[in-house]
C-alpha cells in the first residue's frame, strides 16, 4: 500500500482531527497547500481544477466548511499558486499553521490527498510538499512519509 492509499484510508482519523481546527487559518492553509501542490508542474488545467474541487467537496475531513466556499477559495488560490509573487502569500498562509503542529500535519495530509486525487504523486509535487514541510517546521517523519 502506497503513501496516498495510507492517507486515504486514514480518512476518519483526519476528519476527527480536522474538526478540532474549524477556523480560517486552518481552512486557508489547507486550501493553499492543495493549490500549491496542484500547481507543482507550473499549470493547473481546467479538468484538474474541477477534479480537485469535487474532491474538496467530498472529503469528510472538510465537511465542517461549506464546500462551495472551499471550491471558490481553491480556484482563487490556483491563480495565485502559478504566479511567483502571489505564491509567497499562499506560503504565508501555510506558515501560519506552524503555530499548531497537529493542525499543520492534518492540513498537509489533507492537501496531499486532495491535490493527488488523480493518484499520481509526481516528483514536482513531492518537492512542493518538502517546501511546505519546511515552511511549517515539520519533517517527513512527522507525516509518516518518505518523499
Regions inferred by a protein language model and the residue ranges of each:
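Small-residue-enriched hydrophobic alpha-helices in membranes
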Residues: 1-37, 43-147
Amino acid at each position: 500500500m502506497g503513501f496516498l492509499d495510507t492517507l486515504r484510508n486514514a480518512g476518519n482519523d483526519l476528519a476527527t482531527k480536522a474538526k478540532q481546527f474549524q477556523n480560517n487559518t486552518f481552512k486557508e492553509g489547507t486550501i493553499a497547500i492543495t493549490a500549491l501542490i496542484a500547481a507543482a508542474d507550473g499549470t493547473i488545467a481546467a479538468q484538474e481544477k474541477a477534479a480537485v474541487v469535487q474532491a474538496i467537496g467530498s472529503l469528510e475531513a472538510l465537511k465542517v466548511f461549506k464546500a462551495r466556499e472551499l471550491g471558490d477559495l481553491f480556484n482563487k488560490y490556483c491563480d495565485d499558486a502559478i504566479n511567483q509573487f502571489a505564491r509567497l502569500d499562499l506560503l504565508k498562509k501555510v506558515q501560519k499553521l506552524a503555530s499548531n503542529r497537529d493542525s499543520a500535519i492534518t492540513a498537509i495530509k489533507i492537501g496531499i490527498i486532495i491535490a493527488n486525487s488523480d493518484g499520481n504523486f509526481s516528483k514536482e509535487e513531492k518537492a512542493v510538499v518538502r517546501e511546505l514541510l519546511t515552511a511549517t517546521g515539520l519533517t517527513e517523519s512527522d507525516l509518516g512519509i518518505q518523499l
